[in-house]
């Protein structure tokens, strides 16, 4: 429940970012973003950007325990941390080259929020894991993502590409397993106890879930000891 609260908080903030970039896209290019997201997601206001800025300490979350957390929880934390890191890097480094001042300012503003998100999600990761344990989990995460793409892909040509990448990541996973055993005397099953992937990722509509989160948490914010509290209680 704690991790879900953490993710739902930033979900509404990224929902706001989607809305603002969609507005910019239509304003400057005349392109309707609904076509690009396949109508899986509604493009509408989320938590306003101006309400997303917080004190740095209020973005630090409690870490999960790699020893007791469910495999899907560890995967979710690893996936969202990597995704937010890439997003932040893109906004902060590439956004400055956007061809309009309006767009550059939007990238800069939202890039600051993405930096908060990177702090929030990376704080969920277990700081007690060793470098090689993290390497194993990293490779396992990539295998999980590629296999999800394989199973969900409908274009046979693209499916073969996902399969090729999955096989490559499996070899990386075996290499990480060997390093863990050689240098730390640990078995992979100590980090990944189940050889079967958790429920795979699927691309599909999530409108109802987003509406529910919007309805129940739109006025929430975060403080150091709580990932989601009503603003009115501050």
Residue locations for each model-derived region?
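Non-heme di-metal
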Residues: 1-234
